[in-house]
């Protein structure tokens, strides 16, 4: 999903400055549950880590998302993708995100922060009516418990902080510093057991489908 080419040269210096300013502001004062990953050599390739919101099947997961700015930005919206695998009605198999803010409701003054907050909101309130993943949309409407179980299982398998490249355990609110390393081995054993359990659940669930 990483971009094969950059649109930096096609963006106006004013747009580049505005984007960098906004990213630096978010780095200094991050929105709750969102951490931007700045690529200073290519501001058209923006990535961020979004914490799965509490009370959703995505809770305890960390999801890496990517925004790709095209040459007409901000007149036209960027494309947005989940780089972390996720089971969600509004996320296609290739990770592309469908949300009105990036389509008919786009306005040039919305900005990067607004987009990332909208994506986080989509984890709280999916929109099955405009589903890119029809199976997830149908399941959410007709069999919510099954949808929730599948989404939670995908989160536990694919959206663990280490796998998403969060890299900095110190950013986690529950982290108490040195003790994290002490318990790393135990955490790994627990994760392995959890994976075995999830795989069994997955097989059982797939038989029912």
UniProtKB/Swiss-Prot annotation:
Pathway assignment: Protein modification; protein ubiquitination
Reaction(s) catalysed by this chain's protein: S-ubiquitinyl-[E1 ubiquitin-activating enzyme]-L-cysteine + [E2 ubiquitin-conjugating enzyme]-L-cysteine = [E1 ubiquitin-activating enzyme]-L-cysteine + S-ubiquitinyl-[E2 ubiquitin-conjugating enzyme]-L-cysteine
Keywords linked to the UniProt accession: ATP-binding, Cell cycle, Cell division, Nucleotide-binding, Transferase, Ubl conjugation pathway
Example GO biological process: cell division
PROSITE patterns: UBC_1, UBC_2
Biased composition, class Basic residues, residue ranges: 200-209
Protein function: Catalyzes the covalent attachment of ubiquitin to other proteins. Acts as an essential factor of the anaphase promoting complex/cyclosome (APC/C), a cell cycle-regulated ubiquitin ligase that controls progression through mitosis. Acts by specifically elongating polyubiquitin chains initiated by the E2 enzyme vih/UbcH10 on APC/C substrates, enhancing the degradation of APC/C substrates by the proteasome and promoting mitotic exit.
Protein name: Ubiquitin-conjugating enzyme E2 S
